[in-house]
Amino acid sequence: MRVSQTYGLVLYNRNYREDDKLVKIFTETEGKRMFFVKHASKSKFNAVLQPLTIAHFILKINDNGLSYIDDYKEVLAFQETNSDLFKLSYASYITSLADVAISDNVADAQLFIFLKKTLELIEDGLDYEILTNIFEVQLLERFGVALNFHDCVFCHRVGLPFDFSHKYSGLLCPNHYYKDERRNHLDPNMLYLINRFQSIQFDDLQTISVKPEMKLKIRQFLDMIYDEYVGIHLKSKKFIDDLSSWGSIMKSD
């Protein structure tokens, strides 16, 4: 085994035998790995075994089996997120999305930093729905989906009232609408935002203000994109879909 010091985000844990746990951690430098924690309830690591916990770990890495946690420091527990059902649900979804987007044991520091920053912004109170949309758009390439939301697939002009074409997997400008009789007839303003989401840097993001009607259009479009081009169905996604129906009751209370 080798020793590695790295930041890591706990994805989930599950019981193993009587009092042991298997803990999956997405680390910045070692990728996603499974860690064995013996006597978890009595372990000094118990405080950092919960999902959505980030810490600086000292790890014993086994490239051919289970790895082990040797020590930790600098714990970030996302208290605001964990105390809010809506924030927690969206945070859990993007974490699950990151989990399925890359293989185990493969380092992806860029994705780790992106996920960590997204969770921090949710914790800080920025719009968790739009942050999730940005995460979804920028994660598409991890699933091998390369869609251009910037210019027309035929003439490459920009800044026009575009529509999306599944036939051409991209945008059509008004001069080329005729190329696809089954184009989606989408709101061009929504596609403009999707294009912004594809390239936006979180360091440039200070505030988010998107009307509910536009949020719904974005949500429906990204659901369509993920269904057709990615094809994954996560329990955490179904839960936030259900929130849109009964969650409004809780918000009104």
From Swiss-Prot:
Keyword DNA damage: yes
Keyword Methyltransferase: no
Gene3D superfamilies, per the entry: Nucleic acid-binding proteins, Recombination protein O, C-terminal domain
One GO location term (cellular component): bacterial nucleoid
Keywords annotated in UniProt: DNA damage, DNA recombination, DNA repair
Domain of life of the organism encoding this protein: Bacteria
PANTHER family given in the database record: DNA REPAIR PROTEIN RECO
Function description: Involved in DNA repair and RecF pathway recombination.
Similarity-based family: Belongs to the RecO family.
Listed name of the protein: DNA repair protein RecO
Species for this entry: Streptococcus agalactiae serotype V (strain ATCC BAA-611 / 2603 V/R)
Chain's gene name: recO
